[in-house]
């Protein structure tokens, strides 16, 4: 039977550990001599330098295949989303309630519109160009300053009676409010095969007390988004791009009754029946005007 090994004392263990850390007989530190530590350190330095260089080279080659003028992330929706101004969200979506006799109930709404349209002032649009072609504005090269592409102007005065210039209250005071409709941007999206997309607003459910459909006055006329604002080439290619707008002035909203309204963008390549996204191609909101 093998003899049992003698159990080492604490002092012996400490002595062995000290000799492992530094052995004066062999000149080893942590099991290696100084020269071996130098060589192994140089090996790992060279190894990680080479690995870092290879990684940087692969990353550089990959970045050369990426177009800097194409967004890194894009939505999978086929059609752009549609937004509304002023945008007041309640528990069940967009809900706008105000009293024509109390300006405190609609002052914030008009201020929201003024703040939004500040980006469409002549000063804010001075870097864009005037476009009148009413056709798609294709740009294959970067002919604008700083290696960019031109953007077409859209100024607030194009919204005429809903611009906030002639009527700073946007019709809220008289119970005929203006709402501004905007399509979200999709790079290189073409809304139709040649006809300008237009906005069409209607009651979701016809109010019983109103025997006629929703009456709307659109600005610009016919409620169209001119084709020369398309296609959009991205934020880097068109840093001064502004979304075109359509204003809808609602003329026959009944008093003291909540009505549901939907505004759709009518175009060949715009869909508005996506059950998973209620804002694709259209915007729905509830409106109640009290007196």
Swiss-Prot record:
Location in the cell: Apical cell membrane; Cell membrane
Entry keyword set: Cell adhesion, Cell membrane, Disulfide bond, Glycoprotein, Hydrogen ion transport, Ion transport, Membrane, Potassium, Potassium transport, Signal-anchor, Transmembrane, Transmembrane helix, Transport
Stretches the record annotates as immunoglobulin-like: 194-291
Membrane topology according to the record: Single-pass type II membrane protein
GO BP annotation list: cell adhesion; intracellular potassium ion homeostasis; intracellular sodium ion homeostasis; pH reduction; potassium ion import across plasma membrane; potassium ion transmembrane transport; response to lipopolysaccharide; sodium ion export across plasma membrane
Any single Gene Ontology cellular-component annotation: apical plasma membrane
Post-translational modification summary for this protein: N-glycosylation is necessary for assembly and functional expression of the pump at the plasma membrane.
Entry-listed glycosylation sites: 99, 103, 130, 146, 161, 193, 222
A molecular function GO annotation: P-type potassium:proton transporter activity
Sequence similarity: Belongs to the X(+)/potassium ATPases subunit beta family.
UniProt-listed NCBIfam families: Na_K_ATPase_bet
Protein name as annotated: Potassium-transporting ATPase subunit beta
């Amino acid at each position: 039977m093998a003899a049992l090994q003698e159990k080492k004392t604490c002092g012996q263990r400490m002595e062995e550990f000290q000799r492992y850390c530094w052995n004066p007989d062999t000149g080893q530190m942590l099991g290696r001599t100084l020269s071996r530590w130098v060589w192994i350190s140089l090996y790992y330095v060279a190894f990680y330098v080479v690995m870092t260089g290879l990684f940087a080279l692969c990353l550089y080659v990959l970045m050369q295949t990426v177009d800097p003028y194409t967004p890194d992330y894009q939505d999978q929706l086929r059609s752009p989303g549609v937004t509304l101004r002023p945008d007041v969200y309640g528990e069940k979506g967009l809900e706008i309630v105000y009293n024509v006799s109390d300006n405190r109930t609609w002052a914030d709404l008009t201020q929201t519109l003024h703040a939004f349209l500040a980006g469409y002032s002549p000063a804010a649009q001075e870097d864009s160009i005037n476009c009148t072609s009413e056709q798609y504005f294709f740009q294959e090269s970067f002919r604008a300053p700083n290696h960019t592409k031109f953007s077409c102007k859209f100024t607030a005065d194009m919204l005429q009676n809903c611009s906030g210039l002639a009527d700073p209250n946007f019709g809220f005071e008289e119970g005929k409010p203006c709402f501004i409709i905007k399509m979200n941007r999709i790079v290189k999206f073409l809304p139709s095969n040649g006809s300008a997309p237009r906005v069409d607003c209607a009651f979701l459910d016809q109010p019983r007390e109103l025997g006629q459909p929703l009456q709307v006055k659109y600005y610009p006329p016919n409620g169209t988004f001119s084709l020369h604002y398309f296609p959009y080439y991205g934020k880097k290619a068109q840093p001064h791009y502004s979304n075109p707008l359509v204003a809808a002035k609602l003329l026959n909203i009944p008093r003291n009754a909540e009505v549901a309204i939907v505004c759709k963008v009518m175009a060949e390549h715009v869909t508005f029946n996506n059950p998973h996204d209620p804002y694709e191609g259209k915007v729905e909101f509830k409106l109640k005007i009290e007196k």
